[in-house]
């Protein structure tokens, strides 16, 4: 908990817990009890089963079961990555995201495979909370200005932007200014 405390007490607005969700859900519950909406959970799945420890370990826990458990302990935001799609620029796993969005009331952020403006539009139309665009920005597959306009103009769901005042986040390499990731 010391690391979570440190980040949240020193200006970081949200901490994402990944492997801890499957390996130590009690820790996640304590963190959520203390920090509420400032704790999000990252669920990475390989063939629908949750992976941990940098994707080295695949558990016997289904991603929907973990999401439901996290919702029960108070997690409000889940970042979902289909490992097979991550970095492949082949589009997100919309079906798994749709199932996840229907299974829990948590805010769902898509990660993995988002490669075009059309992918962003499809995810928005699925009423997801957001999307992480990594490699597509790095390779130029997504126009940053268009992505931001789509996110701010229509918003994934306007109510979320109004309620939480979320803004797209852009991650850049400090020395070169190269855009590395956009989270909208």
Briefly describe each language-model feature range.
Residues 2-86:
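Conserved anion-binding
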Residues 27-34, 39, 101, 120-154:
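C-terminal helical cap(s) of enzyme catalytic domains, especially alpha/beta-barrels
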Residues 1-11, 17, 26, 95-131:
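Catalytic cores of alpha/beta
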């Amino acid at each position: 908990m010391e690391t979570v405390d440190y980040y949240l007490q020193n200006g970081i607005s949200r901490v994402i817990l990944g492997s801890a969700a499957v390996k130590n859900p009690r820790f996640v519950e304590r963190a959520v009890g203390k920090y509420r909406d400032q704790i999000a959970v990252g669920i990475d799945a390989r063939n629908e089963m949750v992976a941990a420890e940098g994707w080295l370990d695949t558990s016997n826990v289904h991603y929907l079961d973990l999401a439901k458990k996290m919702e029960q302990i108070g997690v409000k935001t889940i970042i979902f990555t289909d490992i097979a799609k991550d970095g492949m620029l082949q589009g997100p796993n919309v079906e798994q995201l749709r199932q996840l969005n229907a299974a829990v009331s948590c805010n769902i952020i898509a990660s993995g495979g988002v490669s075009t403006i059309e992918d962003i539009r499809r995810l928005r139309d699925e009423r997801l909370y957001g999307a992480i665009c990594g490699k597509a920005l790095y390779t130029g597959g997504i126009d940053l200005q268009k992505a931001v306009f789509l996110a701010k103009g229509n918003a994934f769901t306007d109510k979320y932007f109004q309620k939480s005042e979320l803004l797209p986040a852009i991650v850049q390499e400090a020395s070169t200014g190269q855009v590395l990731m956009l989270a909208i």
